Amino acid sequence: MQSSIPLKQSHYHLFKGLKVLKSSHPEVRKIKRQQSGHSAHGNKVWRSSFVILDYLETHPLQENSCALEIGCGWGLAGLYLRKFQNISVKGIDIDPSVQPYFELQNTINGCEIDFEACSFESLSQQTLSEYQYLIGTDICFWDELTQPLFDLIQKARTAGVKKILIADPGRPPFWALAELCAEKLGSEVITRRIDKPWKSEKYILVIT
C-alpha cells in the first residue's frame, strides 16, 4: 500500500526506515483541531518509542510471529515490526482518539495494522495466548498503573507469551514495576541510548 498523502521532509523524522510524523504535519494538525482532548497522553510520539526501535533493530523478533503493542499511541513499535520484521501486529490503546494518528502513521509508511480501543486490564488470558510478544512504550506513568501492569505481565507469561518489552524514561512507577518483575520473574532492565533524532537515554524492561 502506497501513501498518497503529501509529505515534506520537514514534517517527519526518518528513523530506522520509518517516517515518523511531526506535529507540524498538516494531517496531524487537522486531527488535533478535530478532537476535543486526549484521555491518556496519546497525542504525541514519545521518545521511548525511538529507543525501542533501536533495540528491536539489534534484537529482532522471530519472523512470522505475532506481537501485541499495548498503550500503542501512534504505534511506532508495531509499525516497525510489521514493515521490517514480518511480524503480525495489533495495537491497543485505552484512548480511542489516538486511532486517527495510528492509522495516519501506518498509511504514511505503507502498512495496515489493526487497532482496538481497550484497556490492557481487559485482555483475557485467551486473547494473550494468540501472541508471542508484548510491547509497550511509556505506559507506566502513574503509580496506579504499576500493579495492573504487573498483573498483565503475569497473565501474559501464563498464556505463553515468550517475551515482554516495556520502554520508559525511568519514572518511579516504572522502577516499581521493574523491581516487582525482578523479584518475582527474574527480569532485567537494559539502558539504551540513541543520538538521533535527538540524544536520548531510556530504559527497557525485558521479561522472558
Model-identified regions with their sequence ranges:
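S-adenosylmethionine-dependent methyltransferases
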Residues: M1-T208
